[in-house]
A protein has these predicted regions:
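Protein maturation boundaries and topogenic segments
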Residues: 1-74, 81-86, 135-151
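Acidic/glycine-rich C-terminal interaction modules and beta/coil loop segments
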Residues: 49, 67-68, 73-76, 87-151
Length: 151
């Protein structure tokens, strides 16, 4: 009797764990690829919250998931926020002309973006192997953000 009750409880718990993300604003996401290393390893699991454009505020250096124009998903870090001027000059990051101490940038590359009110700049943490981030794609629209990382 005890064993049967335990098995039923175990199965119910598995159902709840599997369906919890489907009925709430939270999701488990698997990291695919090395673009966020060393912060997030390939195949790591993240607990993330669905992003609501009208109520959620973005924070610089937060980790988010976004989708590109062919509905492929990427996990990246927010570097630039709406209405900011983001520049990378001689491997140094400037936000609205103020130098930001960081070691995130590759050598011998310069970039400059003036963001609109619905745009952000995203980089992967593995700057030499980051794939599809704003250095390749330019600014990302806020409407493309799917979920934000919960720490």
């Amino acid at each position: 009797m005890y064993r049967k009750t335990y098995k039923i409880f175990e199965n119910l718990l598995l159902i709840v764990i599997n369906f919890f993300p489907q009925i709430t604003k939270y999701r488990y996401i698997r990291v695919n690829g090395p673009s966020m290393e060393p912060t997030l390893k390939n195949n790591s699991i993240l607990f993330m919250k669905r992003f609501n454009l009208s109520t959620d505020k973005l924070k610089r250096f937060s980790i988010i998931r976004y989708k590109d124009s062919v509905n492929k998903f990427y996990i990246k870090r927010i570097i630039g926020l709406p209405l900011e001027k983001i520049e990378i000059i001689d491997s140094k990051l400037f936000i609205d002309s103020e130098y930001q101490e960081t070691d995130i940038l590759e050598k011998n590359k310069n970039y400059s973006w003036m963001l609109k009110k619905n745009q952000i700049i995203l980089f992967g943490d593995n700057y030499l192997n980051s794939g599809f981030d704003s250095r390749k794609l330019g600014p990302i629209n806020l409407s493309d953000i799917q979920i934000t990382h919960i720490r």
